């Protein structure tokens, strides 16, 4: 499940060399601006925290925290003012629309900062939960692609699409690490 339908552009990764203190990933929805939950759970917070209240969450502007069914907490930050579609206490599923990508809080352009924390509050790499790699680049949700598509393989910027018949042909002729025929 990806945060945005269509193309998801990672503009800043989780704790990469350029920003080792960055506890999340920054994503831009190139085709769709609606932010979707990547996991089910209960909305623990939906709103904004003022700078005067103290704490660092004021930097996130409008944000939604999902207390996941798996014990993790999922944060979707910098949402547009007036765009929140959920409220605290509401149960959500993966795919539920939460709000719209925005530029609220400490932000220098419209994007969504996405963070995942474990049960102890420790930030963990959120890229896999968002269906992207922890690397700057553009990633596409292939779930809406041809049902015959099996998987994508990306190597050195080259993208190869393998369909189910391709994979079945390889499986049929695979023999101890060597292809036959």
Protein language model features and the residues they cover:
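Boundary/junction segments of secreted and surface-exposed precursor proteins
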Residues: 2-6, 154
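Short glycine/threonine/proline-enriched tight-turn/helix- or strand-capping micro-motif at secondary-structure
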Residues: 9-39, 48
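Residue-level preference for non-acidic, small/hydrophobic
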Residues: 10, 41, 95-98
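Zn2+-dependent peptidoglycan hydrolase active-site motif and core
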Residues: 20-23, 38-88, 110-115
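Residue-level recognition of short, solvent-exposed, well-ordered loop/turn junctions
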Residues: 30, 36, 87-93
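Conserved, short, structured surface segments that act as functional micro-motifs
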Residues: 55-67, 90-143
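Acidic/polar residues in short coil/turn loops that connect beta-strands
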Residues: 70-71, 120, 156-158
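Short, surface-exposed polybasic-aromatic patches that bind anionic ligands, especially phosphate groups
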Residues: 144-181
């Amino acid at each position: 499940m990806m945060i945005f339908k269509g193309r998801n552009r990672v503009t800043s990764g989780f704790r990469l060399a350029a920003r080792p203190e960055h506890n999340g990933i920054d994503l831009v929805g190139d085709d769709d601006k609606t932010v979707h939950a990547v996991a089910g759970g209960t909305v623990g917070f939906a709103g904004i925290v003022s700078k005067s209240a103290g704490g660092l969450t004021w930097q996130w502007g409008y944000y939604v925290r999902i207390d996941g069914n798996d014990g993790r907490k999922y944060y979707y930050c910098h949402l547009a003012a007036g765009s929140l579609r959920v409220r605290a206490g509401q149960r959500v599923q993966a795919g539920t629309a939460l709000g719209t990508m925005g530029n609220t809080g400490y932000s220098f352009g419209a994007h969504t900062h996405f963070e995942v924390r474990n049960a102890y509050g420790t930030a963990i790499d959120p890229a896999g939960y968002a269906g992207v790699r922890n690397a700057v680049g553009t990633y596409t949700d292939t779930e809406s692609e041809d049902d015959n598509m099996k998987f994508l393989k990306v190597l050195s910027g080259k993208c190869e699409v393998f369909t189910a018949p391709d994979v079945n042909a390889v499986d049929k002729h695979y023999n101890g690490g060597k292809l036959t025929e």
